[in-house]
């Protein structure tokens, strides 16, 4: 299986290479720190070389620095170099800090999260002018907070480049803090993270003491945090503002570079199907199918979802697409806990469906699909395949495992490794086999091609 399109070097761990423990040509071997610095310098040269050759801005902490340092459309060589720079820098920090500073660094990260939460709650991001500066005294008055507390927390945030102090007694936006106001996607994610995710993370121990062995989706850290027996989706659906915020956050994640639908387009040989019918199970309002329809004119689509989503999706597709696209896309009301009504489709697509569900429910969902497969049908599962420890870069692995933990905290679910996916297939039907697993470069998700053996 391709994990993320990046070679991890000769030792297969964390993207670094070594020069051997016994030296080369009589020279002493480089220390782990020297190897990391060597890799850092090499990949920094590659990254900066690309940026300079294309007259692109180099990474900077200045207020007008770009939000994204490297376009996701940049060539793979530049993308790999950036990831390796990040990986080497992270490992250098961890290596030089050593075990003695571990707890100090952990608590620093916790404080950054709480400062983000505090700043969001008291509207500090919005009250600081986007241009120029404001005194701590005036800002504290506008926010209704104590000036000393504001100054203490702001200056801690500045150690992580959140805000800046251009002169004593005054605060201004940094590139990062400004982006968390002006970029709607980042702003929504900030509010979601600080109002929902932060209390959920803090309630994990409480949940596991209260329900030590439960995998029920309504007995997770989310339920402990908000003192509810409802599943997360049910709970937020009763709060219109929170539900709308969640929808915007999901849209932002779905359109982020590592979740971009271009990876769905490139992750399977769609053109090789010729004229074919695709059933998108839980396909929402049709973003995936539109992208595929634009690239492959021989494909026709049925998008299945719950009634109000189907109603909205049908309108959106008709209003926002040419007839050549819209006429090839149909909508159908469907509950994936019932038997699949479309029999013998060429493709059954389930994109980001299973990570919300535990093993038993995932088996039920897939079984209902498999019962309607034809002998030549494919089930395409596009979801996370968690890598084996140490087989991808540290910067990628910690994000992937953070998502895995997040699924547990919100739903008592998980992101699965390859063995976890195989276990689901075996529980559904022993005839099922994985035909291929493809992880397009730059994608967090993999396309798992499942067929009847």
From Swiss-Prot:
The keyword S-adenosyl-L-methionine applies. S-adenosyl-L-methionine binds at residue 305. Pathway: Secondary metabolite biosynthesis. Disruption phenotype: Impairs the production of bikaverin. Leads to the accumulation of the intermediate oxo-pre-bikaverin. The active site is at residue 355. Keywords: Methyltransferase, S-adenosyl-L-methionine, Transferase. Residues 8-25 have a biased composition (Low complexity). Pfam families: Methyltransf_2 (PF00891). Disulfide bonds: none annotated. This is O-methyltransferase bik3.
């Amino acid at each position: 299986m391709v994990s993320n399109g990046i070679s991890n070097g000769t030792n297969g761990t964390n993207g670094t290479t070594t020069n051997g423990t016994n030296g080369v040509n009589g020279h002493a071997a480089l220390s782990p720190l020297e190897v990391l610095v060597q890799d850092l310098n090499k990949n920094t040269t590659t990254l900066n070389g690309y940026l300079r050759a294309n007259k692109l801005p180099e990474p900077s902490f200045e207020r007008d620095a770009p939000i994204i340092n490297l376009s996701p459309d940049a060539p793979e060589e530049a993308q790999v170099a950036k990831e390796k720079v990040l990986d080497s820098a992270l490992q250098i920090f961890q290596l030089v800090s050593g075990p003695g500073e571990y707890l100090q660094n952990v608590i620093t990260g916790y404080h950054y999260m709480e400062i983000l939460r505090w700043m969001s709650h008291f509207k500090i991001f919005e009250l600081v002018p986007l241009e120029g500066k404001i005194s701590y005294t005036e800002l504290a008055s506008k926010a209704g907070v104590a000036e000393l507390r504001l100054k203490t927390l702001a200056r801690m945030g500045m150690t992580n480049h959140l805000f800046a102090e251009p002169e004593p007694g005054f605060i201004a936006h940094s590139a990062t803090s400004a982006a968390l106001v002006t970029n709607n996607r980042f702003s929504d994610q900030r509010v979601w993270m600080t109002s929902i995710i932060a209390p959920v993370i803090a309630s994990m121990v409480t949940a596991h003491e209260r329900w030590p062995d439960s995998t029920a989706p309504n007995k997770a850290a989310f339920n402990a945090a908000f003192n509810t027996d409802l599943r997360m989706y049910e709970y937020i659906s009763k709060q219109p503002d929170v539900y709308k915020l969640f929808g915007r956050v999901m849209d932002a994640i779905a359109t982020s570079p590592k979740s971009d639908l271009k990876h769905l387009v490139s992750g399977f040989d769609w053109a090789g199907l010729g004229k074919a019918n695709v059933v998108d199970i839980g396909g929402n309002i049709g973003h995936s199918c539109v992208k595929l329809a634009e690239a492959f004119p021989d494909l026709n689509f049925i998008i299945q979802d719950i009634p109000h989503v189907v109603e909205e999706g049908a309108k959106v597709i008709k209003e926002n697409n040419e007839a050549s696209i819209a006429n090839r896309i149909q909508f159908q009301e469907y509950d994936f806990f019932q038997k699949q009504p479309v029999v013998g489709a060429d493709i059954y697509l389930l994109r980001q469906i299973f990570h919300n569900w535990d093993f038993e429910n995932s088996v039920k969902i897939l079984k209902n699909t498999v019962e309607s497969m034809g002998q030549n049908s494919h089930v395409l599962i596009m979801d996370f395949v968690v890598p084996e420890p140490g087989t991808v870069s540290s910067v990628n692995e910690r994000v992937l495992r953070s998502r895995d933990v997040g699924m547990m905290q919100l739903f008592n679910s998980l992101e699965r490794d390859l063995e976890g996916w195989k276990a689901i297939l075996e529980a559904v039907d022993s005839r099922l086999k994985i035909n291929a697993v493809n992880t397009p470069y730059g994608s967090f998700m993999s396309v798992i091609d499942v067929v009847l053996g």
